[in-house]
Amino acid sequence: MNQQSPIANISRFFNAPLAETDPDLAAAIGRELGRQQDGIELIASENIVSRAVLEAQGSVLTNKYAEGYPGKRYYGGCAAVDIAEELAIARAKELFGCAFANVQPHSGAQANQAVFLALLNAGDTILGMSLAAGGHLTHGAAPNLSGKWFDAVQYGVKREDGTLDYEELERLARERKPKLIIAGGSAYPRFIDFARIRKVADEVGAYFMVDMAHFAGLVAAGIFPSPVPHAHVVTTTTHKTLRGPRGGMILSNDLDLGKKINSAVFPGLQGGPLMHVIAAKAVAFGEALRPEFRAYQKALAENAKVLAETLVEGGLDIVTGGTDCHLMLVDLRPKNVTGKAAEASLERAHMTANKNAIPFDPAKPAVTSGIRLGTPAATTRGFGPDEFRMVGRFIVEVLDGLSASNDGDNAAVEAAVGAKVLELCARFPIYR
């Protein structure tokens, strides 16, 4: 039996493509590429990164351990990765007009955890928006670490219009005296009055944290109000509207607080940072500093308004009556359709969305009465108002078909709409 020499094996290790070494995984990746190319991505938390971001994240920096911070590493050989992290930090500070940035958190959830570790002790009271009202798991939801380790108090939205209930927030803050107040969420589509929340935080002696994961790109472009002048600390993901790699980041104008946060991220919560991801963050932040990024964010927000208006014209309700950002929460009850059924039917028509509870939702969390939609990914590939009017009509057509179906069989409508979706996507190709 002929055996390859060790040198030949080493050469293959460094040069053989994935399709040759692991065809099953290569096929799965190819399938996902096809889904992204041939479908309309409407999940509000997803976007499409540039070739440059992909290149940085897939670079040799994945091989390098770099515990610590630039100039203060616990490993040698960090000169190049120090440059990458320093670029990411400098660009983040310029982008958001802040004095401090930590770009090492692996995710938005870990960025939030690092802030908790820096500012809180187990059992402290925190006040955040409830998940049912549009908040995030990490803001005190019962199943999450934030709801288990802390005395989590939750504020919500007003029943009459779905907007943030500032009076409830202020009342709970005065009654419960939280150590930390959190603003921001995962399914809240309106501007937030950060100055008003900071005022009550100061009144009760609380830290004020804003999780701007969803609207960070809009903040960077000056389209959504910036929380940076008002919050003690701001967290974000680096994907979503910011259009970078999946990761997290923490910002502040308080340098003393920044020292606590640095210690909380490393060595408190994480070990080695993901230097290939940090390099990709630097690329994305550089892209966001260019004039075309502001134009993209402006288009993203305008497209969201057009999509919401088209859905209303089609007989659907939008929670809060519209949107100030990239996302909207669609109430499906006028069509007598569940979020679970809508998500599945839309996906069969090559449109990806996610079922989502609406405020005061009577349906179970696994079923829901709504879907959440967003415009970041389709705007990235070039969709404008005309295309989003088409998308809105496609969605209404699928939901009307689902509503009219007694047995849930919407195959004919899904096929007809799916063909139109494929035709539209072919006009706006990605990763050719």
Swiss-Prot record:
GO BP term (any one): tetrahydrofolate interconversion
Swiss-Prot/TrEMBL keywords: Amino-acid biosynthesis, Cytoplasm, One-carbon metabolism, Pyridoxal phosphate, Transferase
Keyword Transferase recorded: yes
Modification sites for N6-(pyridoxal phosphate)lysine: K240
EC class of the enzyme, as a word: transferase
PROSITE patterns on file: SHMT
Molecular function GO terms recorded: glycine hydroxymethyltransferase activity; pyridoxal phosphate binding
One Gene Ontology CC term in the entry: cytosol
Major location (coarse): cytoplasm
Binding positions for (6S)-5,6,7,8-tetrahydrofolate per the UniProt entry: L131, G135, H136, L137
Protein EC: 2.1.2.1
Catalytic activity: (6R)-5,10-methylene-5,6,7,8-tetrahydrofolate + glycine + H2O = (6S)-5,6,7,8-tetrahydrofolate + L-serine
Subcellular localization(s) per the UniProt record: Cytoplasm
Pathway: One-carbon metabolism; tetrahydrofolate interconversion; Amino-acid biosynthesis; glycine biosynthesis; glycine from L-serine: step 1/1
Cofactor: pyridoxal 5'-phosphate
PANTHER family: SERINE HYDROXYMETHYLTRANSFERASE, SERINE HYDROXYMETHYLTRANSFERASE 1
Function: Catalyzes the reversible interconversion of serine and glycine with tetrahydrofolate (THF) serving as the one-carbon carrier. This reaction serves as the major source of one-carbon groups required for the biosynthesis of purines, thymidylate, methionine, and other important biomolecules. Also exhibits THF-independent aldolase activity toward beta-hydroxyamino acids, producing glycine and aldehydes, via a retro-aldol mechanism.
Subunit structure: Homodimer.
Protein name (Swiss-Prot/TrEMBL): Serine hydroxymethyltransferase
Biological source species: Acidiphilium cryptum (strain JF-5)
Source species taxonomy: Bacteria, Pseudomonadati, Pseudomonadota, Alphaproteobacteria, Acetobacterales
